[in-house]
Amino acid sequence: QSFAVYRIPGEKVPRLLTQAEEEIRLIYDLQELNGQKGFVIAPFRVSEMCPVVLIQSDGWGQSLSLDDDTEEEYEASLQIQEQENFQTSYTKEYADCFQAFINALRDGTFDKLVLSRRITMDKGADFSLSSVFRAACKRYIHSYIYLCYTPQTGIWLGSTPEIILSGEKDEWNTVALAGTQPLQDGKLPQVWDEKNRKEQDYVTAYIRSRLLSLGIHSTESGPYPAYAGALSHLKTDFHFSLRDNNGLGDLLKVLHPTPAVCGLPKEEAYRFILENEGYDRHYYSGFIGWLDPNGRTD
């Protein structure tokens, strides 16, 4: 049975959605999300092999309690910490890919490029998805945490500080997230160099232009430092209203993929990543969450 468990930033209690497999809807164009309601699992690149999946549950789902720490959760939190500190030697393929990205930035072809890579790790005999999910909820209190499964996507567990779209009625929000620094003694850094601020300016200008392309005039607040696990990013909030809340698919299509996971200029960076990154991201760096044009979207 398909399901999604997710914890919205600022909330203490995660929610659970389930759906019979025959009810799952597959979507091949983000515009088809217009007027739709359900839990969306969208890939980095929509394709026949990697469609947008919509779990069409009737509501937000039942609440789940996060019990006191168990020994399993303690072990899971250690696994998360080990992965945060995980270092691996560069493979030749990754080194070549990294150099291609650097060269494209240095010659001025792109203002921003986001390179990712795939790492395979042994999960161990006592690995527990539910324990890791609960541990992540407690460790990353400022992030959107999710654990989901459908036959089309397989199992995905993740955490993201970037909320591509949230809101309801006439109050909607998106963010520009760029620039990275480690926390300083667990606190947000207040001094940011020119490189990080310039990167944030690029992304903010992009989000602003994407909204304006749909006739959306927003109010901005920021940039300001925001938590992202053991790191901090510069963040700018965009607040706006929509003429028609049934057009959320149109908005998601112009925003995705965001510069935080792709690059600038968007279309050129997107094609460069597909041609040079060396693997298919599938649902990594896509977007995920509850969509409801007549209720709350997160």
Predicted regions and their residues:
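Non-catalytic accessory segments adjacent to catalytic cores
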Residues: 20-122, 127, 188, 194, ...
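An anion-binding catalytic pocket shared by soluble metabolic enzymes
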Residues: 2-13, 122-202, 295-298
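A residue-level signal for conserved active-site and pocket-lining positions in enzyme catalytic cores
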Residues: 40, 108, 165, 205, ...
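Intrinsically disordered, low-complexity, charge-biased terminal/linker regions in eukaryotic proteins
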Residues: 1-30
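A glycine-rich phosphate-binding loop feature that marks nucleotide/adenosyl-phosphate handling sites
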Residues: 150-154, 223-231, 287-291
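Glycine-rich, small/acidic residue-mixed loop/short-helix segments
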Residues: 265-267, 272-298
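Short, surface-exposed recognition loops or helix-turn segments adjacent to catalytic cores
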Residues: 113-119, 149-150, 222-225
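Contiguous alpha-helical scaffold segments within structured protein domains
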Residues: 62-92, 98, 122, 175-274
